[in-house]
């Protein structure tokens, strides 16, 4: 079974949906807490939240994250700019279910290991933001780092979120190569980037993905209302 997880990206106090991560592109949706509550009222019990400003080291939106975590979702995973133990613990104190980390293991392995040691691997999801060349992208998807497979072999966590950045926010379809990555790992397997149709969801389920994170296809209505595929 594949579970569908709506996403909320927050920038400057507003829920947004960017295209390929480019600031100013895509949709401005409004108050993120209101959007989250609407999602909850529609019967979704899992949510993916990203603080874009914190990720870009240009402020933070923690007050909205805190309020979203109080709504009543069974599971809220939060990412964006988590670079130290203090922030990781603070987010967990807000009752978020897990934190999402991407750049830190590559740029500052010691800080990552400190976080892992204190809060535990079972509270950390690693986001593998990658391109068609098979490299992990960091620093706002502007810098290539290491090969995806090298990354997967280097770290352990609750699970991995595979984000295919070239199709993020486009609804152009998934990256079928993700099936070659998920077979290498244990734990939760999540995917984001380009999901635009029910066929994409069926493929991801076939590949062994547990959660499909949807943004543009949710807010544009093409996949809104779908919660599972089998």
Swiss-Prot record:
GO MF annotation list: 1-(5-phosphoribosyl)-5-[(5-phosphoribosylamino)methylideneamino]imidazole-4-carboxamide isomerase activity
Pathway annotation: Amino-acid biosynthesis; L-histidine biosynthesis; L-histidine from 5-phospho-alpha-D-ribose 1-diphosphate: step 4/9
GO biological process per UniProt: L-histidine biosynthetic process; L-tryptophan biosynthetic process
Coiled-coil features, chain-numbered ranges: none
InterPro entries: Aldolase_TIM, His_biosynth, Isoase_HisA-like, Isoase_HisA-like_bact, RibuloseP-bd_barrel
Family: Belongs to the HisA/HisF family.
EC number(s) reported in the record: 5.3.1.16
Highest taxon above the source species: Archaea
NCBIfam families from the UniProt entry: PRK13586.1
Location (main, coarse): cytoplasm
Active site: 9 (proton acceptor), 129 (proton donor)
GO CC entries: cytoplasm
Keywords, sorted A to Z: Amino-acid biosynthesis, Cytoplasm, Histidine biosynthesis, Isomerase
EC top class, as a word: isomerase
Subcellular location per the Swiss-Prot or TrEMBL entry: Cytoplasm
Underlying gene: hisA
Organism annotation: Sulfurisphaera tokodaii (strain DSM 16993 / JCM 10545 / NBRC 100140 / 7)
Protein name: 1-(5-phosphoribosyl)-5-[(5-phosphoribosylamino)methylideneamino] imidazole-4-carboxamide isomerase
Record's catalysed reaction(s): 1-(5-phospho-beta-D-ribosyl)-5-[(5-phospho-beta-D-ribosylamino)methylideneamino]imidazole-4-carboxamide = 5-[(5-phospho-1-deoxy-D-ribulos-1-ylimino)methylamino]-1-(5-phospho-beta-D-ribosyl)imidazole-4-carboxamide
């Amino acid at each position: 079974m594949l579970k569908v997880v709506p996403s909320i990206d927050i920038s400057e106090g507003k829920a947004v949906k960017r295209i390929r991560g480019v600031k100013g592109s895509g949709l401005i949706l409004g108050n993120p807490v209101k959007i989250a509550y609407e999602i909850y009222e529609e019967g979704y019990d899992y949510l993916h939240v990203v603080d874009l400003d914190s990720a870009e080291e240009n402020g933070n939106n923690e007050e909205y994250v805190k309020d979203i975590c109080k709504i009543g979702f069974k599971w809220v995973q939060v990412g964006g700019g988590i670079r130290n133990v203090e922030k990781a613990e603070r987010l967990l104190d807000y009752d978020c279910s897990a934190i999402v980390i991407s750049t830190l293991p590559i740029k500052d392995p010691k800080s990552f290991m400190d976080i892992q040691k204190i809060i535990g691997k079972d509270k950390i999801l690693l986001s593998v933001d990658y391109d068609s060349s098979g490299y992990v992208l960091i620093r706002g998807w502007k810098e290539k780092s290491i090969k995806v497979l090298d990354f997967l072999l280097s770290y352990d966590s609750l699970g991995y979120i595979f984000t295919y950045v070239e199709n993020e926010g486009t609804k152009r379809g998934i990256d079928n190569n993700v099936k070659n990555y998920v077979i290498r790992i244990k734990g939760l397997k999540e995917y984001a980037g380009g999901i635009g149709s029910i066929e994409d969801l069926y493929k991801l389920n076939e590949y062994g993905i547990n959660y499909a994170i949807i943004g543009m296809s949710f807010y544009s209505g093409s996949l809104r209302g779908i919660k599972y595929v089998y």
